[in-house]
Amino acid sequence: MKFSESWLREWVKPAINSEELAHQITMAGLEVDEVAPVAGEFTGVKVGKVVECGQHPDADKLRVTKIDIGEEELLDIVCGASNCRLGLTVAVATVGAVLPGNFKIKKAKLRGVPSHGMLCSFSELGIDVESEGILELPEGTTLGADVRDILELNDVAIDVDLTANRADCFSIRGLAREVGVLNRADVTEPTIAAVATSIEDAVSIEVKATEACPRYLGRVIKNVNAKAETPIWMQEKLRRCGIRSIDAIVDITNYVMLEQGQPMHAFDLAKIDGGIVVRMAEQDEKLTLLDGNEAKLNDNTLVIADQNKALAIAGIFGGQESGVTSETTDIMLECAFFAPDHIRGRARAYGLHTDSSLRFERGVDSTLQAAAMERATQLLVELCGGEVAPVVAVESEADLPKANTVELRRSKLDGLLGHHIPSTDVVEILTRLGCAVESTDTGWTASSPSWRFDIAIEQDLIEEVGRIYGYNNIPNQAPVAALNMNDHKEANQPLKRVRDLLVDRGYHEAITYSFVEPEQQKLIVPEIEPLILPFPISAEMSAMRLSLWTGLINTVVHNQKRQQPRVRLFESGLRFIPEESAENGMRQEMMLAGIIAGTRGEEHWDIATNTVDFFDLKGDLEAVLELTANELAYEFKAAKHPALHPGQTAAIVVDGKEVGFIGTVHPELERKFGLNGRTIMFEIEWDAINTRVIPEAASVSKFPANRRDIAIVADEAIASGDIVAECLASGGELLTSAKLFDVYRGQGVEEGKKSLAIALTLQSVERTLEEADITSAVDAIVAAIGEKFSATLRD
C-alpha cells in the first residue's frame, strides 16, 4: 500500500515527522519499504498565466508567449509545447530557478527571440506523470504562488508492505485509524452525507450466489459528464498512491477505494440488458475484459451479469462491452461485499492482478458499502454532475461475516509478553482498536470490529496489545532457569556412536518419511493395522509406518533405478504401533534399521566382484552389538518373518528377548517392490541395545597365551553360536576367547551332522600354564558341550 503522507495527515495529525512516522509504522508491524519524495527538488517555480501566445517567426514548433506571474512586468518566454495556448495557467520556472538535476534557468534567446524563463512539464519538475506538453494548473490558481505549495509537493510517498492479515490498512482510512491508535490521536473522517435523489430510476438486482456475494448495492446516475476533467488534486493523490489517472469516473472509484478501502465499479447503463444478476459463471463462458483480452471463465468464478451475458468478473476486472467511455451519459455504480474465499486465487487463474482483487481476496470491511456508495456519488455529482437515483440494496444477512468474540486471560497475556501491562492500559488499547471490551474474572472478552476480521483467537489479542503498547517498552529481562546437569549414565550408548560406526563401515544415513503407502507396508507387516491419517499429504503417504523397512526398501529401489551398483543404508527413527492402552492410542518405539544390496565392494581390478550376502550384514550388525553388550548378551536364532526369506531369516535376541530381525528380503516382496537382485536388511529396537558394558581395567598378562583347536561334531540343527557360548561359559578363568574358524560337512562326518572347528585361547595373568592346566580346561569344555548338546570330539 503506497500512500501520501499529506493525505494521511488530512485524517490524523500525529506530532511526529516523516522519518518518525515511517519508523513507528514499521515497529507496529506494517513494514515500510520506501519513503520517497513525490517530486524532485526545485526552487523558483511560480504559477503563471499565458496572456499572449503567438507563433515564433522563425520556428514552426515554437510559440512566443507573455506570462503573467502576478508582478508588474510580463515575462517573455518561448515555449515548444503543443498544448501551450492563451489563457492557460502554467508552472513557470523564472530566471534564477533551479530545477531537478541542478538545472539553472537563465535568460536566453531561442531563434533570436528572448526567453526569460521556462514553462514546465511534470517531468521537468521531477513528477512521475505520463503526459504530453506543459503542466496545466486549475484556472483561478493564485498567480505568483509557489508551485510547490499549490501542488503540496513538500510531501513524501510511503510504501508499506502489508502482511496478508492486515487488509484493513489498504486505505487511508485504515492507515489513519492505525496511526491514531499508535499516537492516541483523533481521526477526522470526511463528512459523508446521503446524497439527495432527484430521479426514481433503478436497475433490478438479483443475487443468485449469496454465499459469494452477501451484499450488493447498485445506483443509477444519469446525465453525467464523462468528459469532465479530473481535478489536479485528485490526480496527485492517485499518483502518489501509485495509480494512474484515466478519466473522471474511473478516477473517482479509485479514489474512494484508496480513501475508504472499498473497491467499486461503474457500468454504462445503456449496455445493461434487463437488470443485474450476480451469479457463478458457466464453464467456458467468454468475457472480453477492459484490456481487450478475452477470458474463458471457469464455473467457480463469480460474475456480474445482465439477463443475457457476463459484464464483469466480480471484484476483479470489468468487461469491455459494459465499460464507461467518453460517450457514456448514464451509469450504474456498483458497490458490493464479496466473500474472500470466492475471490482468492481467481485473478491468478486468469493471469490478472488488480487493486480490487488484492483487497477483496484479503477481505473488505463488510459494513462499508453504504458509506462508500454515498462518498462516490458525492464526488461524481460534484465533478461530473448528474441526476441521482436511490440505492438498490440486496443482502443476505446469514452470509455476512459475524464479529469474533475472543477471551483474553490475564495469565496468558503476562506469560506470552513476559511483562505485566496495567489493566487500564489493556482496556484502553483494545478499545482504541475498535474492540468492544468486557471484564471477566480471569481477564476480558473482546469483540473484534468489522474491519479486523483477522482477530480470531487469544494470541491475536495479545499481539495487538503488545505491538500497540510497544515492544520497546517491554524491559529486557533474561530468563531465569535452574542449571541442572542432565543425568548421563556411563552405561548409556549414544546413538551418534552407532551412526559413526556404520558410516565408517561404508553406510549412508537415510531419513525417510514417517508416512508410507498402506499397501506396501501391509506386505512387510501384515499382522498389524496401521494408523491411517485423516488428511494425508497424498494417498501414497497416508499410513504411519510400522517399520523403517518400507522407506529403506523404496530408497534402495530409487538408487538402483539411477544405476547405483552398491547401496548400503541405515536409518534411526520412530515406528508407530496402535495400542489402546498407550498415550493417544499409539506406542512409539525408536528403531535402528539397515539394508544392503548390490556388490560387496567397489569395483577393483585385483578383487573379484561378489554380491552381498546374509553374513555381510550380520557382520556389520555384530559390530554394532559389540558396542552395546558383551558377547554372551546377544544371539541370532533361526526364525520366520513375512518380509524375509524363509530360509535366510534370524531373530535378534538380546538377554533372551527377541528385539529384532535380520534376513534376506522375501522373493515375492523383492518382485513387488521392484528390487534388483538380492537385498538383506535388519531392524532392531534401539532401547534394547542402548546400554553398553562399562569397560573394566584388567591386567595385561606377561605370560604366553596358548591356543588349542578342537573339532566338535554336533547335530545340524544346533546353532554354532550356542556351542561357542557354552565354550566361554565352561572354560573357566583361563579361557580368554573361543572363536569358530571352520565348518565342515562331508566325508568322515555323518549325514545330518556338522563339524565345528573352534580355536580356544588360554592364558593366565599369574604364571605360565602347564600342559596339565591346558588339558584340564579343554577337557572341561568338551565335557560340557557333550553333556548339553550330545556333541562329540571329532577323531
From Swiss-Prot:
Details of cofactor binding: Binds 2 magnesium ions per tetramer.
Top class in the EC scheme: ligase
Major site of localization recorded for this protein: cytoplasm
One of the Pfam families matching this protein, by short name: B3_4
InterPro entries (UniProt xref): aa-tRNA-synth_II/BPL/LPL (IPR045864), B3/B4_tRNA-bd (IPR005146), DNA-bd_dom_put_sf (IPR009061), Fdx_antiC-bd (IPR005121), Fdx_antiC-bd_sf (IPR036690), NA-bd_OB-fold (IPR012340), Phe-tRNA-ligase_IIc_bsu (IPR045060), Phe-tRNA-ligase_IIc_bsu_bact (IPR004532)
Swiss-Prot/TrEMBL catalytic activity: tRNA(Phe) + L-phenylalanine + ATP = L-phenylalanyl-tRNA(Phe) + AMP + diphosphate + H(+)
Family membership: Belongs to the phenylalanyl-tRNA synthetase beta subunit family. Type 1 subfamily.
Subunit record text: Tetramer of two alpha and two beta subunits.
Protein name: Phenylalanine--tRNA ligase beta subunit
